[in-house]
């Protein structure tokens, strides 16, 4: 029964994505792709994986404070989370800063990020496992943890088109 529910949910999600246009060069896959197991921590150092968001659509943004385009797009991700963040959708901004959570907290405070939580992978292993070669890279993850699409480079995440795409 659980497998049937997941299959129906995935079909519904794929149908929704097919109706909405691909925004800002988000490349959607023909079929969902498996993701490697990722390990990272939150601001308090609590270990996490993407399993923490099972059942939600996740917009996983891999970024760093030293990346200029990442810094410029972060407020738009914050506004997208403010607009759509719910029990069905979450923006997960995963920093790969080796300097640690302090530089991320300082940056979030500096630009008044209020809706995103801090997640960090100081080792950079998550980015390597995801084959992220350019920052920022943003991955659309299905409620069952599969990669639906990927955008390499920055985007304006809070445009009406993006809100419609993710809110559909």
Language model regions located:
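Structural microenvironment flanking redox-active thiols in thiol-disulfide oxidoreductases
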Residues: 71-111, 122-129
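Cleavable N-terminal signal peptides
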Residues: 7, 18-19
